Amino acid sequence: MKHNIIELAQQLIRNPSISPQDKGCQQIISQRLAAVGFTLEWMPFGDTLNLWATHGNGDPCIVFAGHTDIVPTGDPAQWQYPPFSAIIVDEMLHGRGAADMKGSLAALVIAAENFVRKYPNHSGKIALLITSDEEATAKDGTAKVVETLMARHEKIDYAVIGEPSCSKYLGDIIKNGRRGSITAELYIEGVQGHVAYPHLAQNPIHTSLAFLNELTTYQWDNGNTFFPPTSLQIANIKAGTGNNNVIPGELYLQFNLRYCTEINDQIIKQTVATMLAKYGLQYRIHWHLSGKPFLSSEGKLVNATIQAVENITKHTPRLDTSGGTSDGRFIALMGAEVVEFGPLNATIHKVNECVSTEDLAKCGQIYYQILEQLLT
């Protein structure tokens, strides 16, 4: 299994599939899956390529999900090895996407391949959902595939996403949920004028200070057993023309909340509106909900994943919901149990991204054992 995983991972890394480009990665994967009897369905949306590949019928349906797109490399000269060389040095596979997530995607594919070879008449259905739009807007990728499947009344019971979940060593963390993410773009109105005549103007920076203080110190909740407390961060703030003699006419503020299951997006919107009204601010606001929080409590998939990780790594993993959003937020809308498990995330999105080849081999074994536990 290890040889096939590493060989496929290298093939994928050598294709510079900067999001939302796929650059032939899914074609490589689809040929392998077709050769072992998977039915292929291409779902292109906009500039994004998506693959839905299935084997078998009936319940339960377990999905292996991943993405072929990657983030840009930055200056290649800063890399120890060329970012698309997929070179192996001291059992470490180097290249953009090695850890996030072409390595674990290769492990998912080979695990599924090996499983259907051994169990061609397995119970239930195995599906692979692969997209080229996870790292960028994530609008035409998994979200659109899920919309299509729901419109066809298809069902997903379990989903394993190969995102790099581990922190210190392989097997320390399984992600069984994610916080919600919502962003606001707020424009606070003032009246532009000359700094020497403040009585003829209204400075939106000055009028917003009390609001900003309350916004950034407000305690949204205390979190719960599964999630840390909701947090808010201002990401961008702008006002003024750049001249020192002009009072700005408008202040622009962009802030993001990562929120837990104790509140929802409607509570967030209403709370902010109440704050703005309290300070008598004139404003325009636009909200963008990236994803609602989801949680897969201990059930068949979580338990099967824990067991497989313990069997292969000899470590007992911790269930965790920290970190950013993932495509799990879309799959969870179908009522599926969702877990994320993959290699270490220490180098993702960084110069000199790399992953242990031994860890990728173990990921493949873990994914294979999850299939065995749920479909045999």
Swiss-Prot record:
It catalyses: N-succinyl-(2S,6S)-2,6-diaminopimelate + H2O = (2S,6S)-2,6-diaminopimelate + succinate. Binds 2 Zn(2+) or Co(2+) ions per subunit. Keywords: Amino-acid biosynthesis, Cobalt, Diaminopimelate biosynthesis, Hydrolase, Lysine biosynthesis, Metal-binding, Zinc. SUPFAM superfamilies: Bacterial exopeptidase dimerisation domain, Zn-dependent exopeptidases. Its EC number is 3.5.1.18. Signal peptide: none annotated. Pfam families: M20_dimer (PF07687), Peptidase_M20 (PF01546). One of its GO terms (biological process) is L-arginine biosynthetic process. Zn(2+) 1 binds at H67, D100, E163. It comes from the Bacteria. Its cofactor is Zn(2+); Co(2+). Zn(2+) 2 binds at D100, E135, H349. Catalyzes the hydrolysis of N-succinyl-L,L-diaminopimelic acid (SDAP), forming succinate and LL-2,6-diaminopimelate (DAP), an intermediate involved in the bacterial biosynthesis of lysine and meso-diaminopimelic acid, an essential component of bacterial cell walls. Belongs to the peptidase M20A family. DapE subfamily. NCBIfam families: dapE_proteo, PRK13009.1. Homodimer. This is Succinyl-diaminopimelate desuccinylase.
